[in-house]
């Protein structure tokens, strides 16, 4: 069954130039797992007949039932190239066998955190786009994530069989549709690409775009056709590739190439791509689907396709599958494209190192990553945890960036909040053993050198979700992943039977380990809260919790949305607060932060860990901050990295530095639970104006300063026109024209705003984009299907926080209702306390 042995793979791991780490990314239902199948089958794991139906990488039962991928799965493939193909590879290679580590990731928006984890450990991405639907919202999101991680894309345009069989398009229409899709992918690439990568746009004539059908198991690149024809006509292959795309035409009478679409007599000429590439495919489809028994053998002979005796009796789609698979096997086209155009770890780590590593780019760890050096000390990034077959244990799944990881080796396990020189979040433990991930199976190996993807056993109890393993004494962490979605939907979970409580607590711990983007915590009123990125994500998480992680029946509250508290103006007067012993005073004002700056902080462009001078320069140049203010940012909050700031604007205050720590921790506390209804603050800037402190150190300890700073922050906040913000989804809905009306009526009921509506050229489909408050999104999918007779498919991504215009302190308004309800739920007094509660008179 398996066509290659673990030893073969292991020996290839040492030739890092011949390794490719790649992930398959796409919009939901564009056929990632199906395409992955044809690759896996080439490596000899699925039997050929099953490919296209097995979806080997969908390992979970719910994935197979729903027909979607939820968790990303890794698999290693082995491939050999012919000598002449190897010569065309633009980077260093040894020999002609290649090892491809492939990660199939989910396309559904709610799981984009899984995609981020997959992208971190790979260097190249195969972007799958549906011919009929084209580039969708999720294609763009994932592609943007990939380019942000400096990952090189190649594209495959999938489901071409749909265009031929369902839409019955003409050759020229198909060419136009292809070229539109390629163009829209390139627009996204040029918008988000990093200069370091150089030109990573995709070009069919260079072989970085493949066309095919995952379901039928066939695909081709222009390079393959150029190969066939260059032998036949005796032309140079490079020249042939240029001619098979774009505006080049072949005149069969004069046997000349031209770039005009008419010949000398004014008769139309056929485009070379249509004539040489699409024509044989169209003819095969026509002959087989119209059951023309006499034409088929002639065509097959011309195309040198030999059928076995039992295959000759097939007809219709079954025959089509067999023939197309022999004519243009998908695996050949895709593997060739992956090997030729995606970078090896040696090439990629050279330009990815600075972006992966938190420390300076000249320290030994970073240099070892740059050189992908298997003999240096170990640097390994764990991007996620994968549950093992025995309950409660996890494999740490990650990639070796430098050094070699061995079974039984002692390593430093550094969690995300580790800083160099401190002991916090650091364990020194031995790795029990290393394994090779193979979709549904694992194979033990002794060691694994730099540039490869590996699973580790025995360190799951020291890492929460991600972290760095190293043997350097002074290594910084690998950078933490930025998720493009945030957990905004939460539910409270209770046990039905009080004796099961310890199991629930244990289960919640396991759940937060197994999913990179789920949050679990205990609220003040003692409820256990689980937060996810959307309805589907939460549903899957809770199902996992009930069935696997905790294994007990649960009571689940209706879903609740996370809000944020913010301010719209500057404080109308200076907020003053005295310490409990009346010897210290803090004076401050609150004011809003521009949305741009908040987004830059949330997206990691402005980073609390950056050098303060460099950060001040960026904030002054790009966001128009005053340089002295930007240099005096004391901290970000909550959690040390949120979009709220404390700026020190005091003049000549004695002992100021001694209270800095207390002020910072009080600010973290205040921004985590705002005064309106205990939600996090967002986009609030606190300016410290003056501080009077007692001369005696004992009278200005943390116990005096922290409550004071918190009260002052609340007072300043409530004096500055407080507002609340709700999370908003961007919804993209695809549907036929007659269903558009139904969509509008549902969106209007749900406070939705339509942003754009456009028809995809060449198809009857409309794409409607709209903003929909997360609060209204529950059951939206169901209502939409009802209103449109099941013809509309929504995709929702968290897009932004929108400020509610009404006053949250007035219980008669929309915002006020939300506040009162939330305060009841949290068990607080119904009325929001006024600023007077937190303000002290002189």
Curated annotation (Swiss-Prot):
**SMART domains according to UniProt:** EFG_C, EFG_IV
Among the GO molecular function terms of this UniProt record, one is: GTPase activity
Q: Which species is listed as the source?
A: Eremothecium gossypii (strain ATCC 10895 / CBS 109.51 / FGSC 9923 / NRRL Y-1056) (Yeast)
Question: What this chain does, per the record?
Answer: Catalyzes the GTP-dependent ribosomal translocation step during translation elongation. During this step, the ribosome changes from the pre-translocational (PRE) to the post-translocational (POST) state as the newly formed A-site-bound peptidyl-tRNA and P-site-bound deacylated tRNA move to the P and E sites, respectively. Catalyzes the coordinated movement of the two tRNA molecules, the mRNA and conformational changes in the ribosome.
**Matches recorded under Gene3D superfamilies:** 3.30.230.10, 3.30.70.240, Elongation Factor G (Translational Gtpase), domain 3, P-loop containing nucleotide triphosphate hydrolases, Translation factors
- The UniProt annotation places GTP binding at 26-33, 158-161, 213-215
Keyword Signal assigned to the entry: answer is no
Instruction: Report which gene this protein is encoded by.
Output: EFT1
> Domain tr-type G spans what residues?
17-253
Give the transmembrane ranges.
Answer: none
Q: Under which name does UniProt file this protein?
A: Elongation factor 2
Q: What is its main location?
A: cytoplasm
**What's the superkingdom here?**
Eukaryota
Query: What are the subcellular locations of this protein?
Result: Cytoplasm
What Pfam family is a match for this entry? GTP_EFTU
Ordered alphabetically, the record's keywords are:
Cytoplasm, Elongation factor, GTP-binding, Hydrolase, Nucleotide-binding, Protein biosynthesis
Family named by the database record: Belongs to the TRAFAC class translation factor GTPase superfamily. Classic translation factor GTPase family. EF-G/EF-2 subfamily.
Which EC class is this protein assigned? Answer: hydrolase
**Catalysed reactions, semicolon-separated:** GTP + H2O = GDP + phosphate + H(+)
Read off the PROSITE patterns from this record. Answer: G_TR_1, G_TR_2
